[in-house]
C-alpha cells in the first residue's frame, strides 16, 4: 500500500513516516501543501494522510483541489483541530475519515 503523509511538523512527520514504513507501508511524505499538490499531481497513492494546518497551501485547499480530479483516493485528515465543526468541514470537503491529534499509530492503522 502506497501512502502520502502530509504533515508540517518535522518531528511528527518523520516519526509517523518511520513507523508506517516499519509496518510495511510504502510512504512518501512532505511538509507543506504546495509540495503535496505537486506529489498528488504526479503520483498515485492508495491513501493520503493530511494535516490541515500547512504552510503555503492549507490542508483544506489541498483536499478540495484533490477532490476536483480524484474522488477515489481515500483521505484521512490528521489534525490538532478537534472541534466537531472542524471534523464536519473536513468530511464535507471530501475526507473519508478524521483523526484528531494526538493519536496512536494503532488507531491510525485500524482506520
Where are the predicted features?
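N-terminal/domain-start alpha-helical segments
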Residues: 1-111
Amino acid at each position: 500500500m502506497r501512502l502520502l503523509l502530509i504533515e508540517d511538523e518535522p518531528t511528527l512527520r518523520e516519526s509517523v513516516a518511520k513507523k508506517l514504513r516499519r509496518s510495511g507501508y510504502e510512504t512518501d511524505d512532505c511538509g507543506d501543501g504546495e509540495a503535496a499538490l505537486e506529489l498528488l499531481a504526479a503520483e498515485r497513492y492508495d491513501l493520503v494522510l493530511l494535516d490541515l494546518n500547512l504552510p503555503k497551501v492549507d490542508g483544506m485547499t489541498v483536499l478540495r483541489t484533490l477532490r476536483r480530479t480524484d474522488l477515489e483516493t481515500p483521505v484521512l485528515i490528521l489534525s490538532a483541530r478537534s472541534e466537531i465543526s472542524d471534523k464536519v468541514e473536513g468530511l464535507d470537503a471530501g475526507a473519508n475519515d478524521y483523526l484528531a491529534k494526538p493519536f496512536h499509530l494503532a488507531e491510525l492503522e485500524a482506520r
